[in-house]
Amino acid sequence: MSKQLIYSGKAKDIYTTEDENLIISTYKDQATAFNGVKKEQIAGKGVLNNQISSFIFEKLNVAGVATHFVEKLSDTEQLNKKVKIIPLEVVLRNYTAGSFSKRFGVDEGIALETPIVEFYYKNDDLDDPFINDEHVKFLQIAGDQQIAYLKEETRRINELLKVWFAEIGLKLIDFKLEFGFDKDGKIILADEFSPDNCRLWDADGNHMDKDVFRRGLGELTDVYEIVWEKLQELK
């Protein structure tokens, strides 16, 4: 498959393929936090992220969620449908943690009666600001129906993920999703799902996600390896 680099991000490089509707996503060993302020090369991270994300996306596809995932090509590569990314980070919170706890001055780990969906404007220059539905419409990112769909689909994905992670003894605290328009203009789930973009706690409250890197709590790949081993119990 001939390929040309079209985008280099913090965690992945994106390449063209011979099919204009398909891309190759190559996962890097780079770990970043605080919008790239903290950065480190961690051997083996790319392989683990690709394994975990490929596994989750395959399960989501089977469950009827429309995603960009086609297949895992190698240890670090996967084949994806090409999408026009919607410049929103869609965050769902099942428990208080991270920026939510800081913003509202509350402890981490409080269960939310109803999961909260938040939007963040994907713009590195502006540090990905927290925005509401009216901002989304003002910026002409999405209209009312699209906003409603993004929230509904995120909540549906959450119900699936919560069950899967509970089965392997992990609590899904929160996560970030990205969506895009496919070649037919349909909104589908894109990007990845790994401990890079979610918070997972074990029964003892230990962090099993990128907070290990953010907060200097241990070796990132050790934690990701445990998550990957647990996920394979779902097969």
UniProtKB/Swiss-Prot annotation:
PROSITE patterns: SAICAR_SYNTHETASE_1, SAICAR_SYNTHETASE_2. SUPFAM superfamilies: SAICAR synthase-like. Keywords: ATP-binding, Ligase, Nucleotide-binding, Purine biosynthesis. One of its GO terms (biological process) is 'de novo' IMP biosynthetic process. Its EC number is 6.3.2.6. Belongs to the SAICAR synthetase family. This is Phosphoribosylaminoimidazole-succinocarboxamide synthase. The lineage of its organism: Bacteria, Bacillati, Bacillota, Bacilli, Lactobacillales. The gene is purC.
